[in-house]
Amino acid sequence: TLALATSGLSAWCIVPALNGSANSEDTGVKETTGSSAYLYSATVGGGYEVDCRQRDLSNNVSGAWTRDISSVNNAAYLEGVSRMFAGHEVCLQFSNNLTTPVRVEVNGSWDSN
Protein backbone atom coordinates (compact mmCIF):
# COMPACT_ATOMS: atom_id res chain seq x y z
CA THR A 1 0.00 0.00 0.00
CA LEU A 2 1.05 3.57 -0.63
CA ALA A 3 2.12 5.51 2.47
CA LEU A 4 1.56 9.26 2.23
CA ALA A 5 3.36 11.71 4.48
CA THR A 6 1.30 13.75 6.90
CA SER A 7 1.77 17.50 7.19
CA GLY A 8 0.63 20.32 9.43
CA LEU A 9 0.92 18.12 12.51
CA SER A 10 0.93 19.62 16.00
CA ALA A 11 4.30 19.62 17.78
CA TRP A 12 2.69 20.75 21.05
CA CYS A 13 3.97 19.24 24.29
CA ILE A 14 5.08 20.16 27.80
CA VAL A 15 8.72 19.20 28.34
CA PRO A 16 9.61 18.43 31.99
CA ALA A 17 12.47 20.31 33.69
CA LEU A 18 16.07 19.16 34.09
CA ASN A 19 16.67 17.13 30.91
CA GLY A 20 13.07 15.89 30.75
CA SER A 21 11.63 14.75 27.44
CA ALA A 22 8.19 14.60 25.83
CA ASN A 23 6.67 13.54 22.52
CA SER A 24 4.72 15.77 20.15
CA GLU A 25 0.94 15.81 20.49
CA ASP A 26 0.46 14.43 16.96
CA THR A 27 2.02 11.43 15.27
CA GLY A 28 2.46 11.10 11.52
CA VAL A 29 3.20 8.49 8.86
CA LYS A 30 6.50 8.20 6.96
CA GLU A 31 6.14 8.44 3.18
CA THR A 32 9.81 7.88 2.34
CA THR A 33 12.08 5.47 4.22
CA GLY A 34 14.82 7.32 6.13
CA SER A 35 13.60 10.81 5.23
CA SER A 36 14.00 13.85 7.47
CA ALA A 37 10.94 15.29 9.21
CA TYR A 38 10.49 19.07 9.14
CA LEU A 39 9.64 21.24 12.17
CA TYR A 40 8.52 24.82 11.51
CA SER A 41 6.94 27.83 13.25
CA ALA A 42 8.16 26.49 16.59
CA THR A 43 7.71 28.44 19.81
CA VAL A 44 9.45 27.53 23.06
CA GLY A 45 8.20 29.10 26.29
CA GLY A 46 10.23 31.35 28.56
CA GLY A 47 12.98 32.07 26.05
CA TYR A 48 14.41 28.59 26.59
CA GLU A 49 15.92 26.23 24.04
CA VAL A 50 15.08 22.55 23.56
CA ASP A 51 16.54 19.72 21.51
CA CYS A 52 14.41 17.74 19.08
CA ARG A 53 14.64 14.48 17.14
CA GLN A 54 12.43 12.31 15.00
CA ARG A 55 11.30 9.06 16.63
CA ASP A 56 9.85 5.96 14.92
CA LEU A 57 7.17 4.55 17.21
CA SER A 58 6.75 1.40 15.11
CA ASN A 59 10.24 0.05 15.84
CA ASN A 60 11.60 2.45 18.49
CA VAL A 61 14.49 3.99 16.55
CA SER A 62 15.39 7.69 16.63
CA GLY A 63 17.33 10.15 14.53
CA ALA A 64 20.08 12.39 15.87
CA TRP A 65 19.17 15.27 18.17
CA THR A 66 18.92 18.71 16.58
CA ARG A 67 20.11 21.17 19.23
CA ASP A 68 18.91 24.59 20.36
CA ILE A 69 15.39 24.86 18.92
CA SER A 70 13.84 28.12 20.17
CA SER A 71 11.25 30.74 19.28
CA VAL A 72 14.04 32.42 17.24
CA ASN A 73 15.73 29.32 15.78
CA ASN A 74 12.28 27.93 15.04
CA ALA A 75 12.64 25.55 12.07
CA ALA A 76 14.75 22.44 11.45
CA TYR A 77 15.05 19.29 9.41
CA LEU A 78 15.12 16.36 11.81
CA GLU A 79 17.32 13.58 10.53
CA GLY A 80 15.83 10.21 9.66
CA VAL A 81 17.60 6.85 9.72
CA SER A 82 17.43 3.91 7.32
CA ARG A 83 15.29 1.85 9.72
CA MET A 84 12.49 4.47 9.69
CA PHE A 85 10.43 2.74 7.03
CA ALA A 86 7.68 4.16 4.83
CA GLY A 87 4.31 3.55 6.49
CA HIS A 88 5.71 3.67 10.03
CA GLU A 89 4.21 5.92 12.71
CA VAL A 90 6.60 8.68 13.80
CA CYS A 91 6.56 11.57 16.26
CA LEU A 92 8.90 14.32 17.40
CA GLN A 93 10.65 14.00 20.75
CA PHE A 94 11.74 17.14 22.58
CA SER A 95 14.25 17.36 25.43
CA ASN A 96 15.08 20.13 27.90
CA ASN A 97 18.66 21.01 28.78
CA LEU A 98 20.15 19.65 32.01
CA THR A 99 20.15 23.18 33.41
CA THR A 100 16.56 24.16 32.51
CA PRO A 101 14.90 24.40 35.96
CA VAL A 102 11.28 24.58 34.76
CA ARG A 103 8.96 22.68 32.46
CA VAL A 104 8.70 24.30 29.04
CA GLU A 105 5.79 24.47 26.61
CA VAL A 106 6.68 23.77 22.98
CA ASN A 107 4.38 24.50 20.07
CA GLY A 108 4.68 24.50 16.30
CA SER A 109 3.95 22.40 13.25
CA TRP A 110 5.74 19.54 11.55
CA ASP A 111 5.64 17.30 8.50
CA SER A 112 6.51 13.60 8.66
CA ASN A 113 7.82 13.27 5.07
Label for each model-derived stretch:
Residues 6-113:
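Post-signal peptide N-terminal regions of Sec-secreted extracellular proteins
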Residues 1-5:
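Classic N-terminal secretory signal peptides
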